[in-house]
């Protein structure tokens, strides 16, 4: 018999029904001869018409995804329970093993006896003297369930077939049950059993072939042989008290049954054999409420073996009276790539960090909106005086840096000696004195006051400037004036050019009074020097010995007293003395009146005169 089954399971292909049935008949003959005389074959009692099977066969069966699932063990009850078969069996794959005589001492959390599984009422446990099966599950806390009718069980449990299904069986190493001596060679080995038909008495009954949605069984190498009950759906048709028929054992060549991870029901994945090697099933998914006692086969699935029979689910799962305890979920296998994907998905998209560039806000439209804010209580004059800078008149609005750097050293040369020092010593002036006109009416102050329109009648009372450059034209000369504070453009009347041609050259210092300031715009301001404005000229050729008389200090009112002024002293000493005594001789009345007419003077100037001179 062992050789016959080895021939069947030598390859993983399916065989014809004739080869399979012949092997089963050979196995039955050996098993029946080895069993006691009073043991009978398991046969269902048909008490309901055939329509039940046909009705159930017409129900659609869902296909389930593949997964791993724990497999609790199944032991048949030791007594006949025809009328009390009301409790549903677990839809998970059960391992069948015979119960020992001391089955009454089994733990209620580890085993569900026949009375607990198949009886709706809490009846006493049948006698343990009968040899049978006990439903045993590693899942604890399973309560009583409502079982289907007896007729459904009779029709459904008539004949079962393991087709295209995989089963993972494990013998519990810590169980207290004792296998028969001839079947206890290796408790860890599992068998692959496929039932196409039962004994001749079962063939007379209506055949119900249930295609099992369990994973397909694949034989592998094993070290021993262990006959395992091949029926997964057992019908207990004997009455209470009658001797229970001994189950038929199908001795199969010892092989470890390996199942592919195919799910047979939603929420109940099968586990790989590694999970069963420890003897404790792990549940990787929530358990479904158990169906009827014959709900091992949930529905017909495609089979590789050509069998012709009614394919229908044995029974439909019913609502249980007690919910099944949800086992702990198994930790899923997480890879680094999966963690990165999940992290990237859950991560909130962030904008790339950019350096915050604060835009300059304008207080009002236009370029003036960017000017710094003027604090209250500060005058524009005080701000400008505190920060001296190059004047922004028309020709020198853009003052070159190289000129500014060179002018720092030239200030000491130009104003620390020569005509400028001579003027200060002759008049006794100190440009550091705030009351002195050298400070109050310096070039930078004149430019600022002209921009603020603070000059009375656009004229400067007293002023001392040095000629930096002079450009002669057909009518008047364009001059650049400077002092220690800055520079300013201006014009010199042609009369002065004719009379003081030799004195008016770069480096000469002019002492002026009542000079008119022409302001064509707020940024452009010009000095208009006429013969009436000139008080004295300090040229480079003049020295201390050139003066016949020491210079007299200037009176407080320079505008009214002209007798103390000494123009042209450096150029012509003799004439300087005469003009100092009588200035009216040098400047006639009619000539002075014409020089005061600024409008006529400005109208005579050409347009290109106000442009920047070519350097």
From Swiss-Prot:
Compartmental location: Nucleus; Chromosome
Broad class of where this protein is predominantly found: nucleus
Origin: domain of life: Eukaryota
Amino acid composition bias (Low complexity), ranges on this chain: 302-317
GO biological process: DNA synthesis involved in DNA repair; female gamete generation; interstrand cross-link repair; male gamete generation; recombinational repair
GO CC terms in record: nucleus; site of DNA damage
Disruption phenotype: Deficient female and male mice exhibit infertility associated with impaired ovarian development and arrested male meiosis.
Region Disordered, residue ranges: 42-75, 213-326, 546-590
Coiled-coil ranges (or none): none
Stored InterPro entries: HROB
Keyword Disulfide bond: no
Annotated Pfam families: HROB
Complex formation: Interacts with MCM8; this interaction is necessary for MCM8-MCM9 helicase complex recruitment to DNA damage sites. Interacts with RPA1; this interaction associates HROB with the RPA complex.
Name recorded for this polypeptide: Homologous recombination OB-fold protein
Protein source organism: Mus musculus
Upper classification of the organism: Eukaryota, Metazoa, Chordata, Craniata, Vertebrata
The encoding gene: Hrob
